[in-house]
Every structure is written in C-alpha cells, then in structure tokens.
C-alpha cells in the first residue's frame, strides 16, 4: 500500500471515528453581493485537510455532542434578553451573558485535520449576536435616546442618497503589543485590579472574561477527547481494503503527524489557559481566539491580525533555536492560520499587517516576512489581505517579491510610512515611536496602536448637490447662476452644508454606542477603559476614539462640474435649465452629447490642470468641515478619502450627471478616477493626486491603479511598479494598490467564467473573485482596462 493511500485512509478513518464532518445538506445560491462562497458546494463527508480548511467556516464541522447549534443559540439568546428585561438588569450584564452563553454552550471541535479549533458559529452573516446588535438593540436605543430630529434627518438622507450613515461597530483592534504580553489570565488579573464588585460595568466584564477561559477549557477537553480517539484507532487496512492487523507500526508512523498536530494544539491551548503566548504557534492561536470571540460571539469586527512578521519573528527564532518546531511545520501552521479567514471569506477581506521600521531605523522585513509572503502566495487567497508598510529602508528582495505577487493578483496594498507619519504628526501629535507602531486596519486605514477604535460612520455623496442644483434649474424660469464661478460657489456651499450636517448627526448617534453594543473583549483588552470605566470601543482608548467621515465620488463630481462649465458656460450648447431637463430624462435624445462628455479628457486622473485645481477645492471644502473638530467620543473627526462600496450604493440613488454618467450608475471610488476615463497613463494619474494636499484627508489617501500587463512584465515591469509606488508616496499619497489586467483577459473571463475560478480583482480596499461581481461591475472594469495606457 502506498503512503498516500494510507494517509487518505487514515484521515478517512479519523473522520469516521468522530463523525464530525457529515451534516445535513443545504442548497446554496448567491444571496447578495457579499455572499462570496455561494459557488463552493457543500461537502457531505470531509476526508482531507484542504477540503476541511476550505469548508470550515462554510458549513458546520463541529461535534454536535459538545453543544448546541446556531438556531438553538438564537433561541437561548432571546430568552436571556427577555429575562434581563424582566428583571431590570443592566444591558451590560445581559450582553456579557449573551457572550458567555455562546462561548459555553455552542458546539465545538478540535480536529486532527486543522491546527485551530472549530465553532458552531461559522457563518458570519448568520451570527446569533448579529441581529441583536445590528438591528434590534439599535432600533430600541435610538428610538429612546436620540432626539427626533436626528433620526428623522439621518434616515431621510440615507433614503434619498444624500449620504449613507450607520452606527459602526466594525472597526476595532486591541493593542496587541500589550495583551500579547498579558495573555488571557493576565487580562483577567488586570481586570480584577480595577473591578468594583456590584458595578454592572465590571461585573459584566468579569462574566465575559470567565467565559473566555471556560471556552479555552472546552477546546482543551475536546482536543484530549479527539486525541484519545485517534490513539484508540489501531487497525489498519491492507491493499484489498480489509481490516487486517491491530497496533501496526506503519499506522502508528502515518498517524504520528495528525497526533502531533492534535497534541501541540492541546499544549498551546493549555499554555494560553495559564499565561501569555510562549511560541509562534501560541501567538497565532491567541490571535485566533481573540478574533473569533470578538467578531463571531461579541459582535465586533477585529480589523487587524497584527503586523504578523513583527510579532512572530522573536517567537519563531526562539522556537527554532530550542528545537520546538521546524520551518516546514511553521509554514503549515501559517497556511492553516491564513485559511481560517480564507474559509470565512469576508467580502471586505480580513486585514493583516506586514513590514515596517524598527526603533533603530532599520527595516522590519526579514526571513519570517519572506516565509509569510511565500505561504500567502501559495494559498492564493483573496483574504486575508496584506496591508504592507513600506519605506526607503524596505529591502529590494521584499519589493520584488511583493510587487511580483501584486501583478499576479495577490491581495496586497502598499502603505507609505513616511506620508502616513507626516499626517499623524500633524493631526495626532504623534511621536516617531507612535508612527513606527501605527497599525494598518480595515480597508487600509492607519491608526495609533493604542487607539485603534476609529469608526467609519458617514459617507457623503459628492454628486447629490449637482443633481439637485440641475433639477432646480430645470424647474426655474430665471437662470439661477450667471457664470460657472457662481454655480461652483453654490455647489461648494451645499457640499459644506451636507458634510456639516453629517458630522452633527454623527456627533449625536455616537453618544449611544456603548448603550447599543457594549464591547466586552475590547474593553477587557484596554487598560485605560478599565481604569476610567469607559467602553473600550465607544470611548475608552487612551488615544484615538476618532470618527471618520468618508468622501464618495470626488472624481466624478469634478468631472460633472467641468462638464457643466463646458456645456453651459463655455460652448453654450444648452442653458442650465436645458441641461437639467436632459439629466431628468437620463440623457434620452442626447446620446451624442453624452458620449462626447464621457470620452472627454478633461477629467480627474488625466493631470488636467483645471480638474486638478477643482479637486483641490472639493477636498478642502469637505475637509474643512471635519478635520480636528471634536466628536462625542473624546476624539476628533477626520476626513477620509476612501468610500468602501458606497460608490455603488449611493450611485444607485443618484440621477444622471453631466459627465456622461447615467442615472443609477456607479461613481468614482476612493481617490481614483471615474471608471474608464483615465486615458493618459499612470504618470498623469499619480500627478493628479499629487496636486492635492494629502494631509487634508488624514483618515487615508488611497489610490487604486489599473495597469496593463505589458507594463508589468519582467524585471523592467517590477521596476516600473516600484517607481509608481515610490513617486506616489513621495508626493504624499498614503496607500496604493494595483489591478493588472488586459481588457481581452477580462472579456474572456466574462464569457468563460469556468476558466477563471480563482481570478481576483481589486474592488476598493479588498479583493473579490471576478466571478462574484455582477455583470455591471465587470463591464466597468473592462471599460477601464480598455482605456489603460500600455506605457508611461
């Protein structure tokens, strides 16, 4: 019998022994845009490592004998809430009980197929806590505690596309440097130092902390059970498939790998039950436990998994020196670690940091960085996404490795440490050490390591004032604006007003964050919150507590304003009223004019002086209403240049605009040009962004750049890509990311999706499989690829 056959049959026997991989089937269809695993068929009986890793967070792989399923948890949570209301207990106590109930009651498993545990709450879109903290509790608290004018104006603006706003609980990162040294027992001891018995604030945290330790105990117990089952499996199978011998030495040798994995997993959990991480594997396990307890059980996205190489290197080097691990084992653990989030397949991707600068000024990139990049490259996952910090000290090998991966569609963003430090010193009085420790979070937002609780609440639609001004002009008998300067001035006045109202509403709705959704884990992880009796997410970080308001459609607004100038005030082809009428019928009867405006080179992204200057004015107008103004959380407001998916959402709520865009179509995303209009090449695009003062958008200053494959070929292509990144950063840009395609390749992928199952494109701050995009989104990428210059 061959070794491979023995391995397959051993795994199959293990799976059969614990009966944990065969469950009721479910029919899957793509539910919506962020359903990224609809294509991945349910597996009735998982027998191999790769399938297990892929399906782990796409179906239930737990041992049902260990606890209850998600539907039962939902009922138990509802009963707990009802009991809490009936008794009049504090919501902080109730929320902690909800966390504890899940940690202590959900079914779990510890499989020999994986280096990390499994939990019943596998579907992030069907978490039992989700509806409670996202819908039920906000509705109850907001109706009771917010002024009527706030909710009325807030919801009205959301409906008509003026903005899109919500209470954000999706952006938190603990200070990993601190809690990694404490471990869970150390966090419990620190909590005890500040806790006041009988105070619901601290009593709730004690409940949650104890539940984390109980949850760890449950994993240990289940691991030992699985290890015992594996040891008891002493029969083997001969070439004919019959059970032939017991206690065979060959079976023992072949099973040693799986037994070793289980034993090391149990040992790691036991170490974490007693103290802080001691090995590189412990670090990964600690991050795993915190993340899934926070996001899947407590309802708070943990938006960074640390600067992985910075944190792992000292542990890995010590492990190798002591003979505790091998590079091969470490690589396998890393693969399994990355696949946890590859399996979850969060549409927005899960951020991981990499690189940076040491205290002595040398680079953080090292031998462990290379291993991590190798494993990431081999996995070829859309998520986790790597938010890489680069600087003049970044070594050539790292540039070449990462840029080669980027041109092959790996999920990488390049953040300039120098421009980010400049913005942080201006707005946060950050020191050099603060800047060195900046953590990359979310899509690609830099934050202080001890203040990474910035919310992204409001998204302002830059096109809506233009739409409304033209609609008003269409109804007006008298021309309301005599020249373009007066039209522009009114636009800027309205943009400033909308931004200010967005800020004022946000100020009110963030007063109740702690009442809506108390953060158990983030509070326990933050000493300042414990000392000051504040919620770790809502307002309890020693620094940070900031609020980002995001700009949507900057480039398209520039294009639309210039189109008004050309059509009405320069060429006088239509009156303002006439142009408004054309917009009201979605360009019907004026296709020739629409195409001319759509194809005009007078657009943001082509280094047109007038477009550049107008962009500067729009950014200044927006930023002046936000930057440095106090929020209600003890921090400040920040203007932000990225817009997540709101360029589509708000585009659907916005009528036709004079730049050639039709009603409902997407607008520009981040600081990038409108899809398909940047025809003058990469140099012109970088120069466009350099024209603006990047410090005006301290939240982030991102550029999505599409390049033709011919630009990126070979060693010359890598040098060209590096030059683009370095010039962008020297000009003050914060983050740049690449999509490298030809229109021909994308058209073929659209026609033959079966040939491109793993093709990824960059959407905004994340990668998405091409086959998960709608045809409309695909067409937009093809249009832009058609116009991308093949040189500089």
Predicted segments with their positions:
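Intrinsic disorder/low-complexity segments
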Residues: 231-258
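N-terminal secretory signal peptides
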Residues: 1-2
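Extended non-globular scaffold/tether segments
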Residues: 207-211
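N-terminal export signals
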Residues: 5-26
């Amino acid at each position: 019998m061959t070794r491979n056959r023995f391995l397959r049959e051993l795994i199959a026997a293990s799976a059969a022994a614990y009966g944990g991989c065969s469950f009721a089937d479910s029919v899957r269809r793509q539910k919506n845009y962020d359903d990224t695993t609809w294509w991945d068929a349910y597996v009735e009986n998982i027998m191999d490592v790769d399938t297990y890793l892929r399906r782990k967070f796409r179906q239930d792989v737990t041992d049902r004998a260990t606890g209850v399923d998600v539907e039962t948890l939902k009922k138990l949570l509802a009963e707990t809430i009802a009991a809490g209301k009936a008794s009049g207990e504090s919501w902080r106590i109730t929320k902690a009980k909800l966390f504890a109930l899940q940690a202590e009651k959900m079914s779990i498993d510890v499989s020999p197929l994986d280096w990390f545990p499994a939990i019943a709450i596998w579907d992030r879109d069907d978490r039992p806590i989700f509806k409670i903290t996202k819908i039920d509790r906000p509705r109850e608290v907001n109706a009771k505690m917010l002024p009527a004018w706030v909710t009325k104006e807030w919801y009205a603006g959301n409906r008509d596309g003026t903005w899109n706003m919500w209470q954000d609980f999706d952006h938190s990162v603990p200070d990993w440097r601190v809690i990694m040294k404490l471990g869970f027992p150390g966090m419990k001891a620190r909590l005890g130092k500040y806790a006041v018995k009988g105070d619901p604030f601290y009593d709730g945290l004690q409940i949650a902390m104890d539940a984390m330790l109980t949850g760890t105990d449950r994993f240990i117990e289940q691991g030992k059970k699985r290890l015992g089952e594996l040891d008891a499996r002493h029969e083997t199978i001969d070439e004919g498939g019959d059970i032939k011998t017991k206690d065979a030495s060959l079976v023992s040798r072949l099973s040693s790998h799986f037994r070793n994995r289980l034993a090391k997993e149990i040992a790691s959990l036991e170490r974490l039950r007693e103290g802080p991480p001691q090995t590189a594997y412990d670090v990964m396990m600690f991050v795993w436990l915190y993340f899934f307890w926070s996001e899947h059980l407590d309802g708070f996205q943990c938006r960074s998994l640390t600067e992985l190489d910075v944190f792992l290197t000292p542990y890995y080097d010590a492990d190798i020196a002591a003979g505790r691990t091998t590079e091969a084992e470490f690589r396998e653990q890393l693969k399994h670690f990355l696949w946890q989030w590859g399996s979850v397949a969060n549409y927005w991707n899960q951020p991981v940091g990499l690189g940076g600068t040491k205290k002595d000024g040398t680079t953080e990139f090292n031998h462990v960085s290379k291993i991590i990049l190798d494993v990431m490259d081999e996995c070829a996952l859309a998520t986790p996404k790597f938010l890489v910090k680069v600087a003049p000290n970044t070594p050539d090998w790292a540039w070449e490795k990462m840029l080669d991966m980027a041109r092959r569609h790996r999920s990488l963003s390049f953040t300039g440490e120098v421009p980010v430090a400049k913005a942080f010193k201006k707005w946060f009085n950050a020191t050099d050490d603060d800047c060195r420790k900046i953590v990359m979070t979310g899509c690609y937002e830099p934050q202080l390591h001890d203040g990474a609780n910035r919310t992204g609440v409001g998204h302002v639609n830059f096109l809506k004032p233009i739409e409304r001004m033209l609609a008003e002009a269409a109804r007006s008998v008298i021309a309301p604006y005599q020249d373009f300067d007066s039209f522009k001035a009114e636009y800027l006045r309205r943009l400033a007003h909308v931004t200010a109202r967005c800020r004022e509403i946000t100020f009110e709705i963030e007063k109740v964050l702690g009442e809506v959704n108390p953060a158990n884990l983030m509070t326990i992880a933050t000493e300042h919150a414990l000392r000051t009796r504040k919620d770790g997410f809502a307002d309890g970080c020693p620094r940070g507590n900031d609020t980002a308001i995001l700009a949507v459609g900057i480039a398209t607004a520039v294009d639309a304003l210039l189109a008004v100038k050309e059509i009405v005030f320069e060429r006088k082809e239509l009156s303002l009223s006439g142009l408004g009428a054309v917009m009201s019928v979605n360009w019907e009867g004026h296709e020739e004019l629409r195409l001319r405006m759509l194809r005009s080179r007078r657009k943001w992204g082509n280094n047109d002086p007038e477009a550049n200057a107008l962009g500067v004015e729009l950014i200044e107008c927006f930023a002046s209403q936000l930057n440095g103004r106090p929020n209600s959380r003890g921090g400040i407001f920040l203007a932000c240049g990225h817009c997540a998916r709101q360029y589509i959402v708000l585009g659907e709520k916005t009528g036709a605009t004079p730049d050639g865009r039709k009603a409902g179509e997407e607008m520009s995303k981040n600081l990038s040009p409108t899809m398909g209009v940047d025809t003058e090449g990469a140099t012109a695009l970088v120069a466009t962004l350099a024209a603006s003062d990047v410090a005006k958008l301290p939240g982030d200053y991102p550029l999505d750049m599409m390049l033709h494959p011919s630009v990126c070929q070979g060693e010359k292509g890598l040098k060209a890509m590096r030059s683009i990144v370095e010039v962008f950063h020297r000009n003050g840009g914060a983050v740049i990311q690449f999509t490298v395609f030809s229109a021909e390749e994308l058209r073929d992928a659209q026609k033959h999706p079966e040939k491109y199952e793993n093709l990824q494109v960059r959407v905004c701050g994340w990668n998405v499989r091409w086959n998960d995009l709608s045809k409309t989104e695909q067409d937009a990428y093809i249009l832009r690829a058609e116009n991308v210059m093949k040189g500089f």
